[in-house]
Amino acid sequence: MKIYLRFVWILIIILNFLLNLFITTNGVIIVNAFKKSLIVAASFASLSLFNSATAELVYKPLEQPVEPAKPDLKIESVNEKFAEKYPNQYNSWRSTANGDGENIIYADEENPRLIVLWGGYAFAKEYNAPRGHFYAVTDVRNILRTGAPKTANDGPQAMACWTCKGPDVPRLIAEWGEKDYFNAKWAKGGPEIVNSIGCADCHDTTSKDFAEGKPALRIARPHVLRALDALEKATAEKDKAEGRPHNNLSFNTAARTEKRAEICANCHVEYYFAGDIKQVTFPWDNGQTVDDIEKYYDDIGFTDWTHSLSKAPMLKAQHPDFEIWSLGMHGKNGVTCVDCHMPKVQGADGKVYTDHQIQNPFEAFDSTCANCHDQSKEKLRDIVTSRKKEVKDVMGRLEDQVVKAHFEAKEAWDAGATKKEMEAALMDIRHAQWRWDYTAASHGGHMHAPEVVLRVLASGLDKVADARTKLAVILTKHGVKTPVQIPDISTADKAWKVMGIDIEKERKAKEEFLKTVVPQWEQQAREKGLLVDPPAQK
């Protein structure tokens, strides 16, 4: 189909050249009419092929298991209760509040194209660079995306938006059961989810092993265990078919190396909110590649939202760090998240412990990178910086092309294009932006697996080229002059205005929410003993 389309357009270009070369000025009107008839004819031919290849998305939710309440499962969510027994681990964990994390980086203000790419979705209101685990609860409260709810049943977001934010989440799932947990508004969790990502997210803190100072790694979120079981099934079948060695990925039976990485898959993964109850689900039934997950979503007809400009059925990637890592050189060589971000260090008391100040490996180079690499810190940093620049450059090109495609699609709709005409181009926009977001939403993909990220971005450029070629045909058919003029989106304020977002209204509502509602949440949490003051530093 692609070859046919390109052949048609090459033919048109050649005919245009010949006509302009040989027809006299007196024949301009005839030439223009002939050129237009050629383009329209090509349009009908190519569009008939496009539309025969694409079906409309209809969401068919996959039925998900729902775990009942488990009142006997005790999860201690207050991180401060472990400070006395494990001071080195606690104090290093608390240090994630320091350094770069103290400052918020407003990514959408640095790159206003994001506001267009997420047009019609809450991410267009505010998107910030990630900070340390210490800030997880604070940041989800503060971000404009969660709105300004006034009651437990109010607001735009689902309870699922809390699911990665701290150990109160598995505690609540155990107390309420998955159905009652997920089938609620985000605001209902406000007085309950007050402890940021910490001890009980990764460790069985009530176990004998933990009491003896052993890691006692545990995943207490049922949906994560189900996802790893599904991934084990998918990858085992692929590895067997392709004659590759296979490592068991089901958490409860996995080896230590796999478990050390899978703990981070509690949160650093791609997921979506499934069904009416908005249940957090990992789309791993086919595997973890960008194509595997795209096929999963396309097969069930899932759409995160409909884009406000193009009307494309969009997908929003979350943060597929575990996926990209596992597909790249570090994952394939068994170098886990803990090896690079949580090295063994010696405390002031002489004890060796795992550093819980999760940070850039270059900050502890001798304990991380130097364990495997013989290059100097400066040499290795130069390599990583160069890879980051390559990724950013290609990512920027893809962003620019997808932004143009959204505006071109809007112009086509405004000119009278039909749903049938637009269907194939919109699917290409969906697939192109999905590839951009799969890479852009990952944390450190340029470091974890640069070859994977660049390959995904390159395929995204192919997809958006297909989209814009199809849109050019549609625009020409409907008499729209090209190139389509793109509004000024050079600043965030200009982009918000173009996209119809009243950012000041959103900010004022959030300010009032933080001033009136959040203090009530914290007071209720203190009364329940869920929120306590940190111990004094010795």
From Swiss-Prot:
Binding residues annotated for heme c 5, in chain numbering: 330, 369, 372-373
Binding-site residues, heme c 2: 199, 202-203, 356
Sample GO molecular function, one term: nitrite reductase (cytochrome, ammonia-forming) activity
Catalytic activity from the UniProt record: 6 Fe(III)-[cytochrome c] + NH4(+) + 2 H2O = 6 Fe(II)-[cytochrome c] + nitrite + 8 H(+)
Gene3D superfamilies on file: Butyryl-CoA Dehydrogenase, subunit A, domain 3 (1.20.140.10), Flavocytochrome C3, Chain A (1.10.1130.10)
Keywords from the UniProt entry: Calcium, Electron transport, Heme, Iron, Metal-binding, Oxidoreductase, Periplasm, Signal, Transport
Residues given in the record as heme c 4 binding sites: 337, 340-341, 448
NCBIfam families documented for this protein: cyto_c552_HCOOH (TIGR03152), PRK11125.1 (NF008339)
Record-given protein name: Cytochrome c-552
Organism the protein comes from: Haemophilus influenzae (strain ATCC 51907 / DSM 11121 / KW20 / Rd)
Gene: nrfA
